[in-house]
Amino acid sequence: MKKVAIIGALLMLAGCAEVENYHNVVKTPAPAGLEGYWQTNGPQRSLVSPEAIGSLVITHAGDTLDCRQWQRVIALPGKLTMLSGELTNVTVNRDLYAIEREGSTLEYDGMTLQRVTRPTAECAAALEKSPLPTPLP
């Protein structure tokens, strides 16, 4: 029992956050210039293969789609929120990913994403199949 308490305290001190219920997360509108389509360019250490592509779609209202593709497409809707003063994407699976923007580059889940004009065909198909609640950029 003491080990559980110690581990819990360490997680709190480390700044780890957890979301109990996705639907209770307060959605934050996208800051100016963040709305749009973002995509990896070239190999990324945090993706499973050099051929894998990571994409993030962000609407003005703060709805998101985290779309990763390699041999299949995994597309998770989410929403932007502020956690401990940091802009964070919370997916429906309750995964938390901090978002840092510098010019036309985003740092997201260990990936570097560049602004693009539209999503990949596979991510566009995922958006058609399961549209986000607010209009796309």
Predicted features along the sequence, with ranges:
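C-terminal motif of bacterial Sec signal peptides marking the signal peptidase cleavage site
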Residues: M12-G15
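C-terminal partner/receptor-binding element of secreted or periplasmic proteins
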Residues: Y108-P137
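Positively charged n-region of N-terminal signal peptides that target proteins for export
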Residues: M1-V4
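Secondary-structure transition/turn motif
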Residues: R68-V73, T91-L96, Y108-T117
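N-terminal helix-cap/turn-to-beta initiation motif at the start of protein domains
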Residues: Y22-Q39
